[in-house]
Amino acid sequence: MSMSHLYGKDEDSDGVEMENFEITDWDLQNEFNPNRRKHFQTKEEATYGMWAERDSDDERPSFGGKRSRDYSAPVNFISAGIRKPAAEEKSDSDSDSETQARRETFPKDFEAKKLRTGGNFKPSQRTFAGGIKSNTDFGSWERHTKGIGQKLLQKMGYVQGRGLGKNAQGIIAPIEAKQRKGKGAVGAYGSERTKQSIKDFPVVDSEEEEEKEFQKEMSQWRKDPGGGKKKPKYSYKTVEELKAKGKVGKSLSAPQKEISQVKVIDMTGREQKVYYSYSQLAHKHNIPGEAPGQGAKEEKPQGFALPELEHNLQLLIDMTEQEIIQNDRQLQYEQDMVVNLTHELEKLSEVLEREEKAIQNLSKVLETVEECERRIQPMCDNPLTLEECARIFEMLQDKYYEEYKMSEKADLSVAIVYPLMKDYFKDWNPLRDPTYGTDVMSKWKNLLEEGHLLSHSAHDASMDPYHRLLWETWVPLLRSIIAQWQPRNCAPMVDFLDCWVHLLPVWILDNILDQLIFPKLQKEVENWNPLTDTVPIHSWIHPWLPLMQSRLEPLFSPIRNKLANALQKWHPSDSSAKLILQPWKEVFTPGSWEAFMVKNILPKLGMCLSEFVINPHQQHMEVFHWVTDWEGMVSLSSIVGILEKHFFPKWLQVLCSWLSNNPNYEEITKWYLGWKSMFSDLVLAHPAIKDKFNEALDIMNRAVSSSVGAYMQPGARESIAYLTQTERRKDFQYEAMQERRDAESIAQRGIGAAAAVPMNFKDLIQSKAEEHNIVFMPLIGKRHEGKQLYNFNRIVIYIDRGVVFVQGEKTWVPTSLQSLIDMAK
């Protein structure tokens, strides 16, 4: 038995080194070792093969390759064994060849990656490249120190026992190794992950990612991964992508607006091309042989190219995509249509419900109206009363308000209410019972009136059932009553209209006053005779002033004419004239009243004063009192004028003649003071009257001072001087007091104006009226075009957007505030 296997079967008995060409375990283990030493075959080895000489320079320390024989080392024995017979070796070689064939069919990455060791020696005897030996005591000095790394980590805030990172999120324990149970491949015994790995990396790759990684590793062992026949790449488009494209893109089937006669020159290709519309340019296809654009990579020449077929296929694809898009749009349109129709159906259902409810309500209203019509028939057993009819209308207004407002209330009231209303007022006498029916009419006003309160014409009122009710049932009855009424008995008629003024529309009240009342008054004024009638005219004219106001102005002129004719033969001794004229002072305008006084009264008063005899010894004062009684009726200037003209010349003449005959100055003083007391303070304050009395004092002083050497009553001079001084002091005190009063009134007026500034134009007019003592008050129930009418001292006005309008003969005339005040005075 040969013992060669104890020394290695690669050596013969002569000690010659032999190299076997069989695949050993080392070859399999280092097949995929990238760090093994690669031996490139030289030219000499290729020529001589195994007989080629080796160069000693090639033998250099390395990690791989066959180590050179070291004869200085002791003999290494291998474990003993039994050499197999030739048959078994052959079978083993066959199995080895099969194993090698199987290994060639798998990629290199699936081989075990083990570094080749230098031979059968201990790990402690192995050396690295460069002759460096591996020693287990290498770096043993680190056992007694922390090292520079530990110091640097502690300087940066590292705490031992915690992980690295800002939030200590690093791992604490080092990476653990898990020993595999057997010698099987990776994953043969299940998952090999440690608890730390599962904790730090809980996410596991999916099977698809593992499959991709597997395919990628499989492709690494191919000879030419980039060469060979490539599989065609398919581009898939989902329906959702096509829908999204259809929302922003244009439809292919939609008609394109082409601009006619547009010449488009395409110079993007190898040669110039001309198109006659932009659509042709958009639908051009690639032509074989065209040069690629600049910067494009040259593609491999195609052996089989059909551009027409490609164009047709692309067109079919586009048409299919467009059909999908159109179907999606049609589906969306139909869905929107369904939603719209649903909303329309809901709206129509609501309308239908409302209409059905309206039909039911109208049916009930119709039944109620028919019942009312049946009960107003003459032969009805249960006749309808006006109160029951009012309750029925209230019920219709409360329960069926919409139908009640939409119905023709005028026709309904004409058919039902008018007969009942005529029957209700058939026996009524408004002059005896003016308040009869006011409560009933007030209720029907709320039921029938539609808000035409400011209407001024019968045409507008015909559209209002309440106005029509009054016009056709109430006004005819009133006409018959007024036709029999005597204007001199005005109190019952005035009371009647005062009770009904708040129930009457403006145009009906105007019609009553203008067409019924005023003609009766005008006719009665024409028949009036102030000389024979015992009833004063103001007693039956003035009660109409609050209702008619400016409507009575046409009557004032004939009244003044009749009064002037009656005063032609009048004498101031007759005091009845004053009683007749005094009520008209506030009715006539100031100008017309003053003109009437100057023409008819002042001449009579002046004639009386001219005939008045002044006798200091026996004075009769009746004539003088006749004149002074008219002081409040005649203006102050007119009174002063007739006194200056007819009284003071005679009075001063009597004084002078008395002083020239050695008078008793005490009696003269009393006579002077007695005549002065006969005048009112208002007359005495007039400058002309003051001058006349001062002139009398001057005459008396001259008379006293000129009597030098003649007999003079003792104390006369001092008495006259004292009288003069006293009278002058009284005049001065009166003037000072008057100035003080004027200053106080001006100051109070200024304070009041500053304290209470008018908020609007109406307040300003009111303040001006108070300053000038003018009556400013609203007229009850009087409006013009919706504006409240006011009485400004017998002048009718209304205010519209800060402008005052005054009633003229035919129209309303705008005027200023100062002009209005002048007209009122």
Curated annotation (Swiss-Prot):
Keywords (A to Z) from UniProt: mRNA processing, mRNA splicing, Nucleus, Spliceosome
Polar residues bias (residue ranges): 122-135
Superkingdom to which the source organism belongs: Eukaryota
Bias (Acidic residues): 11-25
GO molecular function, one term: nucleic acid binding
Compositional bias segments (type: Basic and acidic residues): 41-61, 85-114
Example of a GO biological process term: spliceosomal complex disassembly
Family statement drawn from the similarity comment of this UniProt entry: Belongs to the TFP11/STIP family.
Function: Involved in pre-mRNA splicing, specifically in spliceosome disassembly during late-stage splicing events.
PANTHER family reported in the protein's UniProt record: TUFTELIN-INTERACTING PROTEIN 11, TUFTELIN-INTERACTING PROTEIN 11-RELATED
Protein known as: Tuftelin-interacting protein 11
